[in-house]
Amino acid sequence: KPQVDLDKLRDFKGGVVKKLTTGLAGMAKARKVEVVTGIGAFVDPFHMEVQGDNGKKVVKFKQAIIAAGSQAVKLPFMPEDPRVVDSTGALELRQLPKRMLVIGGGIIGLEMATVYSTLGAEIDVVEMMDGLMMGADRDLVKVWEKFNAKRFGNVMLKTKTVGAQAKEDGIYVKFEGEKAPAEAQRYDLVLVAVGRSPNGKKIGADKAGVAVTERGFIDVDKQMRTNVPHIFAIGDIVGQPMLAHKAVHEGHVAAEAAHGEKAYFDALQIPSVAYTDPEVAWAGKTEDQCKAEGIKYGKAVFPWAASGRAIANGRDEGFTKLIFDEETHRVIGGGIVGLNAGDLISEVCLAVEMGADAEDIGKTIHPHPTLGESVGMAAELYEGVCTDLPPQRKK
């Protein structure tokens, strides 16, 4: 039986992180950006005090962009114990547990569950809601659930975690709800992945005159400008979705606006990706959103069972779905479940932003055999001209 070398795995992960952070430091130096490391807080609207390893330093500024991010939400009844971790702690890979509990059936929880189950851990998942990966259309999640039906142990939906106790042999967790076991369950490791809270109340924003909501978010306009005109904010601290690529885009907008350019955040879509196995990705309007907003829509679903590349990969469980405006046939959203779905969703993102219709996508020549051509085939399917499936009625 293959053995997992955690030391080598940690070293590889550390090497990747070091390479990326070193690259950022190099780019900052090339642009003559001074990096001050430490914990910072505003002193007034034009000064920030930073407490670093070598003492305090006051930074004076004419304009500022707040990118203070968020932190993992903690459950008050969870014991302070190294066997209870958040996603950051889980990525440190201190140990390979025999039995692990993931609290939270969202993207982060399921990604970590995928990692640890791949390494050999027995995984239980508990989720308060009636489904996993909420936010994604249920047909996408259903494929993931079927593929992982035997991968995890007990998946407890509509169930709360109500108590926990640290003992020498593990963390004992008590549940309440529809799928809750009667007795407390013992785990070697517990991951708490129940969301993140913004750091708006930790930076002395009030001293700069920046308004912060009760929950710690900072409200901004379309230029990412706060109520103080020369101070901007981006990322998790300005609201959902808390995604790195959204934050980067907001950063571009804020920097350009601070430079005096007419830059605005007006994205028509923000893609979401669950880096699970299989991956689940979606962008633009979901079917659930269309129904809730009363949007008349049509859809086309191309099954990967008809994809030569998916069949050759031995991974044809997925599908590619495009969602169209019923009247104009423009692409307004889409979802993909399957191998490398996160890489494939980019074409859907561009289609939504550019106002492409089914004919635009369907008549774009895609390389064969690839998973990417499933996007083109879904568009052809909607137009009734796909030759890789039985005849369809032309729209």
Label each region the model flagged.
Residues K1, Q71-V73, A211-E214, E261-P271, ...:
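A short alpha-helix-loop-beta-strand transition element characteristic
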Residues K1-G14, I361:
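Short glycine/proline- and acidic residue-enriched helix-loop micro-motifs
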Residues D11, G15-T21, A25, L91-E92, ...:
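Rossmann-like dinucleotide-binding cores of NAD(P)H-dependent redox enzymes
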Residues E34-T37, A41-G52, V59, G120-K222, ...:
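A Rossmann-like FAD-binding core segment of flavoenzymes
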Residues I66-E122, V126, R151, V155, ...:
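Glycine-rich dinucleotide-binding loop and its adjacent helix/turn
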Residues H259, Y275-T286, K291-K395:
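Flexible, glycine-rich terminal cap/loop adjacent to redox cofactors
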